[in-house]
Amino acid sequence: MDTFFSFYVLPALLILLKSVVLIVVLLIFVAYILYADRKIWAAVQLRRGPNVVGPWGTLQAFADLLKFVFKEPVIPSGANKGVFLLAPLVSAVLAISAWAVIPVNQGWAIANVNVGILYVFAISSLEVYGVIMGGWASNSKYPFLGALRSAAQMVSYEVSIGFVIVTVLLTAGSLNLSDIVLSQHDGIGTRLGLPNTFLDWNWLALFPMFIIFFISALAETNRPPFDLVEAESELVAGHMVEYSSTPFLLFFLGEYVAIVLMCALATILFLGGWLPPFDFVPFTWVPGVIWFVLKVCFVFFGISMVKAFVPRYRYDQLMRLGWKVFLPISLFMVVATAAFLKITGFA
């Protein structure tokens, strides 16, 4: 009985506890990321933004949560009720489950698997099904058009993200997310005789791929200027037109969790994960998880500024950018990186 408890029950309870802690912390973080997004956008437009609920409006996201939860969900009479209600749940659950392999510090991951980056890539690819299910089940032309756009857009930019992952794999020699972070500790700067700093991280050595990943992440998560899936001027709200109350909240939650996930991936692949920007005191005194969160916030700030300053692309411009610009550049970078590592022996 003791053996059964130690080998089966206790590990399962630990995983459950880690999952609950992760979900609670993630949801609170997403609430404040949403608050920051609204504040940044307001500052650019010379507005105040949320400033009523709580000190300086810091509890606005929680007030919105209560508002959505206590509203009555309205289901269109012609909708497929089962798929209509399942779609937002699929979107939210898939977005959260991708975080199982994200290391926010050394050894801080629910599952430290050797193919972690492929797991995240697969989960992010599946998220489009929630959008397609919601658009089809609504039995309305605007949600359906939004769902079709989503399918084409996500498939187009996943190709570029895939080549970015291949490039990072070549430099790190591993698909394990923790190994990818640790490989940036002694990067190109250190090998050239420079001090161990943020110049060792992949953002410098793979700068074109960093830019491609950043822009592709915007398209993958339907963020401006690539928010054509839910373009207000054309499709009202895209696949979420017919949704209200908790189902709408789940779609909204899944969208922002996916955005923060892409910020975390950019941090892990290009910004050194939990590594400090300078490998000496007092920077090494700061816990790695603090550096990780600060880097995620830095990437998200860039995403928010793009939303505030860049106008929305036309759909043909979006597809042309993905297939005629990013695909050739990313493919060339894969070949160039492989050739460089082979010739110089840096791998």
Curated annotation (Swiss-Prot):
One cellular component term from this protein's GO annotations in UniProt: plasma membrane
EC number: 7.1.1.-
Matches recorded under PROSITE patterns: COMPLEX1_ND1_2
Pfam families from the UniProt entry: NADHdh
Main localisation: membrane
Gene Ontology MF annotations: NADH dehydrogenase activity; oxidoreductase activity, acting on NAD(P)H, quinone or similar compound as acceptor; quinone binding
TM annotation in the entry: 13-33, 82-102, 115-135, 161-181, 198-218, 248-268, 283-303, 321-341
Recorded catalytic activity of this chain's protein: a quinone + NADH + 5 H(+)(in) = a quinol + NAD(+) + 4 H(+)(out)
Function of the protein: NDH-1 shuttles electrons from NADH, via FMN and iron-sulfur (Fe-S) centers, to quinones in the respiratory chain. The immediate electron acceptor for the enzyme in this species is believed to be ubiquinone. Couples the redox reaction to proton translocation (for every two electrons transferred, four hydrogen ions are translocated across the cytoplasmic membrane), and thus conserves the redox energy in a proton gradient. This subunit may bind ubiquinone.
Family, as annotated: Belongs to the complex I subunit 1 family.
Assembly and binders: NDH-1 is composed of 14 different subunits. Subunits NuoA, H, J, K, L, M, N constitute the membrane sector of the complex.
Name this protein carries in UniProt: NADH-quinone oxidoreductase subunit H
Organism (species): Mesorhizobium japonicum (strain LMG 29417 / CECT 9101 / MAFF 303099) (Mesorhizobium loti (strain MAFF 303099))
Record gene name: nuoH
